[in-house]
């Protein structure tokens, strides 16, 4: 089970939100590149970046910080990024910078054909991010909850060549209330695409539960507030996950 530290970028700083609310941001670092190096040194084998400003604006907003992170760690570990990716040009620019994968979220829900086009243009490099509240997909930086169930949406992408789906339970994100294992497993069982869990990871019991769900198609987990606030020691958690594989 791969654990992936999250670095959420807001105005060039590393922050964490509660339930996706920009006004509920806690600043953890003024140097995202140093944060990226820290997680690499703790044993991270991949990093997850989110351009929070970009998610709301619909265009990249934190390029200097993203470039600094890539300069610091991209030669050693793959880095993926989501937030504000709405067209093929942006994807190409990000991949040219050194990102390994890009995450299409809002645009995947609004225009599933865009995912197909992106997978064709950049095979193996496209991740779909599905964010849900009570099972229904949310878009535009979680500001709008749609009438689409995430499982129905996920099935649309099965034949497109998506490399994985990141499933975020908005109600759990940043709340330290535990991963929504049931919803994550239901999604993973419903599709042939590997699912990465996100939102609510709190302690080692969550790691154990996620590892037990690997057989259902849960391939990894993104962790944020828990590793920043210390309820999870990242190195210890990854070692535990490796031992349970």
UniProtKB/Swiss-Prot annotation:
Q: What class of enzyme is it?
A: isomerase
Superkingdom of the organism of origin: Bacteria
Keywords of this protein's UniProt record, alphabetized? Amino-acid biosynthesis, Cytoplasm, Histidine biosynthesis, Isomerase
Q: Which family does it belong to?
A: Belongs to the HisA/HisF family.
Its subcellular locations are: Cytoplasm
Gene for this chain: hisA
**Enzyme active site:** 8 (proton acceptor), 131 (proton donor)
Q: Name the NCBIfam families on file.
A: 1-(5-phosphoribosyl)-5-[(5-phosphoribosylamino)methylideneamino]imidazole-4-carboxamide isomerase, PRK13585.1
Task: List, alphabetically, the CDD domains matched.
Answer: HisA
Organism for this UniProt entry: Neisseria meningitidis serogroup C / serotype 2a (strain ATCC 700532 / DSM 15464 / FAM18)
What's the protein name? 1-(5-phosphoribosyl)-5-[(5-phosphoribosylamino)methylideneamino] imidazole-4-carboxamide isomerase
GO MF terms here are: 1-(5-phosphoribosyl)-5-[(5-phosphoribosylamino)methylideneamino]imidazole-4-carboxamide isomerase activity
Among its keywords, does the record have Ligase?
no
According to UniProt, this protein's pathway is: Amino-acid biosynthesis; L-histidine biosynthesis; L-histidine from 5-phospho-alpha-D-ribose 1-diphosphate: step 4/9
Please provide, in alphabetical order, the Gene Ontology terms of the cellular component aspect for this entry: cytoplasm
Q: What is its EC number?
A: 5.3.1.16
């Amino acid at each position: 089970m791969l654990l992936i530290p999250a670095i959420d970028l807001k105005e060039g700083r590393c922050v964490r939100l509660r339930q996706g609310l920009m006004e509920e941001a806690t600043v953890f670092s003024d140097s995202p590149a140093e944060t990226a190096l820290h997680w690499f040194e703790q044993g991270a084998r991949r990093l997850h970046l989110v351009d929070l400003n970009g998610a709301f604006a619909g265009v990249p907003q934190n390029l200097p910080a993203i470039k600094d992170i890539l300069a610091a760690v991209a030669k050693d570990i793959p880095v993926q990024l989501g937030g504000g990716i709405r067209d093929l040009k942006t994807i190409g620019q990000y991949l040219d910078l050194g990102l390994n994968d890009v995450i299409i979220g809002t645009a995947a829900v609004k225009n599933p054909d865009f995912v197909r086009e992106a997978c064709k243009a950049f095979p193996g490099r496209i991740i779909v991010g599905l964010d849900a509240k009570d099972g229904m997909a949310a878009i535009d930086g979680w500001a709008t909850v749609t009438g689409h169930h995430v499982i129905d949406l996920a099935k649309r992408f099965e034949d497109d060549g998506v490399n994985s789906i990141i499933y975020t339970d908005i109600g759990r994100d940043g709340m330290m209330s535990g991963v929504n294992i049931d919803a994550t497993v239901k999604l993973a069982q419903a599709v042939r695409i590997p699912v990465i869990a996100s939102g609510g990871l709190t302690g080692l019991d969550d790691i154990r539960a996620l590892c037990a769900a690997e057989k259902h198609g849960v391939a990894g987990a993104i962790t944020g507030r828990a590793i920043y606030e210390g309820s999870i020691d990242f190195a210890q958690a990854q070692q535990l996950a490796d031992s349970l594989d």
